[in-house]
Amino acid sequence: NGFVRRIKWKLVINMRKKNFMNYCGLLGIVALLSYTVAVVFSPLAYPGYNWMAQAVSDLSAANAPSLRLWNQLSSLYSVCTLVCAMMVCAGIQGRGSRTLRLGIYLFTAMEWVSAVGFSMFPLSDSGYAGTFQDRMHIYSTIVVVLLSIISLVLIIIAGIKDKEYRLYGAFAGIALGMMLVGAMGMNIVPKEYFGVVERFSVFAAVGYNAVLGVQLFRIKPEK
């Protein structure tokens, strides 16, 4: 009992030392939960949707029957993701190497391109209908993928060079691995399993944003 009380007291003290920026890091977890709930439950409003074969973006296509439910369930995702990412950029100022900071800045830029690009240009139909809107959706995806890869590689390099930030690099490696599995898997596996490997890619970025948020929460505030 005494040991438990000491642990609780230390937790209380640590929580009191946190500032507003630290707590904003927890929004990364909120974003991950919001996105996960949307991915899991939106198919309930999409008759015939096969999550193993279809992409997540089909759920938010302009004519998808699940669009309304998707928007409701993912309402916290975009705003929490962007607030968390911007706060991480602010919190990393003066910390770590220039490579680490550049990687985080590019990752945040990717989040903005994702939020704005996919909101402005959702798929016009499930799959790919070939319209201008669909082409812009694909271009947004390409930019998001390139920024994701470059940013994660930079963070991995920074983590290798600086042991203090090796957790950033380790989780960036996991996220990059998930993206590569998704990218290569979509061209290798049968169409019946396209949705399975595609989810590795989409959850890699969302998950890593949550990791950055947790790391921000753990950072000791400057006096």
What function would you assign to each model-found segment?
Residues 72-84, 143-155, 203-217:
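Hydrophobic cores of alpha-helical transmembrane segments in multi-pass inner/ER membrane proteins
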